[in-house]
Amino acid sequence: MLERLIAFIDGARTSLDIAIYDAHLDDGAGARVVAALDAAEGRGVQVRAVYNDEHRRPIPVPPPPTGPSTLARLAAAVPSTAIPGIPDLMHNKYMVRDRDTVWTGSTNWTIDSWTGMENVIVVVPSADLATAFTEDFEQLWTRRRVEGSGGFDDDPASIAFDGEPLTVRALFAPGRGRAMGHLVARRIAGARTRLRICSPVLTSGPILSTLAEVLDDNRTDVLVTVDGPQMREVLAQWDRDGRAAWKRPLFERVRASGRLALKPSRPYQAGPPHDYMHAKVVVCDDIALTGSYNLSHSGEMNAENLLEVTSNPFSDACAGFCERVHARYAG
């Protein structure tokens, strides 16, 4: 994973914009990433970074970063802007290279993310998609806050994947956060042959209620995987907060369907290792949705991104990943 990250940075020729939530690497890996960024600047690449400014307020889902942070070294190496993580997180994990290629997904720059967690990275060679991500980055860069970013629509872009046409578009939260949740819910409702879901948690009301209805109707093949300890924490929060208690019966219907797998990850602790189920992927027939957005209510208010990809080969690859993860933790 480190080699892929460095190779992407090394491929930059004119510009590299980075939006990263969490960067906790050991000294060796951190030094190599910083060296790659220094080398990019040395060959004339304009490098910029925005990152989440860590804080002490407890956030059980997602768990807060821990251990030695690489963000300070990143900020010292390249022009950077810290985005306050209060009240909402700068939760993106993307790069835009040369205004024509996007790297995004669920993967932070941490050893745990690379070795202990299920995660997804998508690299899309598309100037049209890069334009949308650049617009989101510019909003974060200039405003220096999560609030007010992502409030625009992106037109679909077309590229080739595995010899077939692929259509992709992006949505960004918080500006389009509610639209993200409703889009995922609509795609779930429309699934006819297969529905595959990997997410740390399921707390979005529209998504959870639609999923429960699809399972009750038994009209498509469904497999769902979430993180066990994180969902238990969510259920405890719902029990304490009467305003969200209506969601518990919906989740119990999902659990009772027999289609749910819970990853028995290590409960949150201050130091490594961390091995959460961290991938964010939804496959509805030939449509795949993936990015940093984790199907949660809070995700609609964070700085997040979501790709909607229409492609049989790409959706097959995402479905295969979800099926392998589900098989690992089912039963």
Each model region followed by its residue ranges:
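A short, aliphatic-rich alpha-helical micro-motif
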Residues: 9-10, 97, 188-189
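PLD/PLD-like phosphodiesterase catalytic module centered on the HKD motif
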Residues: 1-6, 28-102, 107, 111-144, ...
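Long, charged amphipathic helices and adjacent flexible linkers at domain junctions
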Residues: 150-159
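Acidic/histidine-rich, surface-exposed loop or edge segments in extracytoplasmic proteins
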Residues: 17-21
